[in-house]
UniProtKB/Swiss-Prot annotation:
Keyword Transcription belongs to the record: no
Keywords: Cytoplasm, NAD, NADP, Oxidoreductase
Protein name: Glyoxylate/hydroxypyruvate reductase B
Organism: Escherichia coli O1:K1 / APEC
UniProt cross-references to Pfam families, sorted A to Z: 2-Hacid_dh (PF00389), 2-Hacid_dh_C (PF02826)
Active-site positions on this chain: 237, 266, 285
Subcellular location: Cytoplasm
Database matches in PANTHER family: 2-HYDROXYACID DEHYDROGENASE-RELATED, GLYOXYLATE_HYDROXYPYRUVATE REDUCTASE B
Family the UniProt entry places it in: Belongs to the D-isomer specific 2-hydroxyacid dehydrogenase family. GhrB subfamily.
Entry GO MF terms: glyoxylate reductase (NADPH) activity; hydroxypyruvate reductase (NADH) activity; hydroxypyruvate reductase (NADPH) activity; NAD binding
Signal peptide: none
Recorded catalytic activity of this chain's protein: glycolate + NADP(+) = glyoxylate + NADPH + H(+); (R)-glycerate + NAD(+) = 3-hydroxypyruvate + NADH + H(+); (R)-glycerate + NADP(+) = 3-hydroxypyruvate + NADPH + H(+)
Record text on subunit structure and interactions: Homodimer.
Function: Catalyzes the NADPH-dependent reduction of glyoxylate and hydroxypyruvate into glycolate and glycerate, respectively.
Amino acid sequence: MKPSVILYKALPDDLLQRLQEHFTVHQVANLSPQTVEQNAAIFAEAEGLLGSNENVDAALLEKMPKLRATSTISVGYDNFDVDALTARKILLMHTPTVLTETVADTLMALVLSTARRVVEVAERVKAGEWTASIGPDWYGTDVHHKTLGIVGMGRIGMALAQRAHFGFNMPILYNARRHHKEAEERFNARYCDLDTLLQESDFVCLILPLTDETHHLFGAEQFAKMKSSAIFINAGRGPVVDENALIAALQKGEIHAAGLDVFEQEPLSVDSPLLSMANVVAVPHIGSATHETRYGMAACAVDNLIDALQGKVEKNCVNPHVAD
């Protein structure tokens, strides 16, 4: 008899078929308490869980006594109670490598669109404001040869550094938990403390996961240390930034502009002050959102769940020690 798994995110037909070759698959719309209650028998028997964008906490795990592995279609896993999973010896799988290049593309797009005011001036053209040769009020700022500060030199940080160094001749500063020898050798990146990075960078790109240590890492104190001409980019996790402090910094002119792919609350409220600022490019968490990459992430998540329930945790496992 095949193990039972719960799928709470739609998959392409071929990937669903692959999953069904190994498991009895039960599809649900979400992991809300109502859904769990309505499908209590299914949740009670499930050994695997696959999906994204839903909280997996201790309360849910109580309803799933046979759960052995969870697989998220994402690199981030801050919506999972890792301690509760680990205490139950439940494996948590994620997709850390598939989306690296695509997210780095998004970061570079935010750098370019904020610096050159692409969204703002495109909207002005559509509004009929281009009636003569443009003047300084339409101008942006250069990207090439400007200093890029990267906070978080992981896979995505490295991919961004590659684009910035070879494509735009940008000097690179970085701050991370440890020195990154490859970044220093390949891109001439310079490690520095966070204060120095903030003070010297023309673009500050934040690429950090959300943890207890990184929550509101960026607040009023950090924005006050940045150049008034600097542009802030966040494509990591929204709550790493105190959004009210960011809004205040933009309103006071402490920083020049911001390109944001993530927010403290998602979707972003329609009455957020960020949406009324011409110098803010706000996009709806599109970091990995291409057809190719989202398919690749889903395929990876399917393979991860198959591997996990077969006891294979050599890659893409957040807590592999629970399999010992």
